[in-house]
């Protein structure tokens, strides 16, 4: 009886170890993987979006980073705001897509978004993202 219990305990311990290893790999997803899982369904793997309803993430976001309110915009839009990943992971995804899809259009002295900046911005969902974008993005054109 003891050996049967010991064998069952080893099996449970082995299964628990596999589960912990698998879950740690899930939580350690790269920014690219998180982008593919949570963003590419609408914005496509290439970041091109689906005009006119889903905006592109290519080139345009780099130019937006010169306007302070637009840094928050990237975090506060419904898709980013509600994605089921941590603030730290969202920060990595946004910084990754800025560099991956926008390196040629980022401001000369671009600073990556910080986790604190993302955490704070994520507290305030945009009620009307298009209106906010029109209001603050005009400042780039001025």
Predicted regions and their residues:
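Flexible coil segments in periplasmic/lumen-exposed cytochrome c-class electron-transfer proteins
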Residues: 88, 99-142
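Sequence/structural segment immediately N-terminal to covalent heme-attachment motifs in c-type
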Residues: 27-48, 69
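Sec/Tat-exported extracytoplasmic proteins
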Residues: 43-46, 61, 77-81, 97-101, ...
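Stable alpha-helical elements in mature extracytoplasmic
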Residues: 31, 66-73, 89-90, 114-121
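Mature extracytoplasmic domains of secretory-pathway proteins
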Residues: 84-94
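Gly/Gly-Pro-rich "capping" loops immediately C-terminal to redox-active cysteine motifs
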Residues: 48-83
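Bacterial N-terminal signal peptides that target proteins for export
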Residues: 2-14
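Bacterial N-terminal signal peptides
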Residues: 11-23
């Amino acid at each position: 009886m003891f050996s049967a219990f010991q064998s069952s305990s080893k099996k449970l311990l082995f299964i628990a170890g596999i589960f912990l290893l698998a879950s740690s790999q899930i939580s350690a997803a790269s920014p690219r993987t998180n982008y593919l899982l949570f963003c590419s369904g609408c914005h496509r793997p290439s970041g091109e979006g689906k005009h006119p309803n889903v905006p592109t993430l290519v080139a345009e976001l780099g130019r937006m980073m010169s306007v302070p309110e637009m840094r928050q915009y990237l975090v506060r839009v419904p898709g980013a705001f509600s994605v089921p990943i941590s603030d730290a992971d969202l920060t990595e995804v946004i910084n990754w897509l800025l560099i991956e899809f926008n390196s040629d259009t980022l401001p000369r002295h671009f600073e990556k978004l910080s986790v604190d900046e993302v955490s704070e911005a994520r507290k305030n969902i945009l009620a009307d993202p298009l209106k906010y974008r029109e209001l603050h993005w005009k400042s780039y054109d001025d």
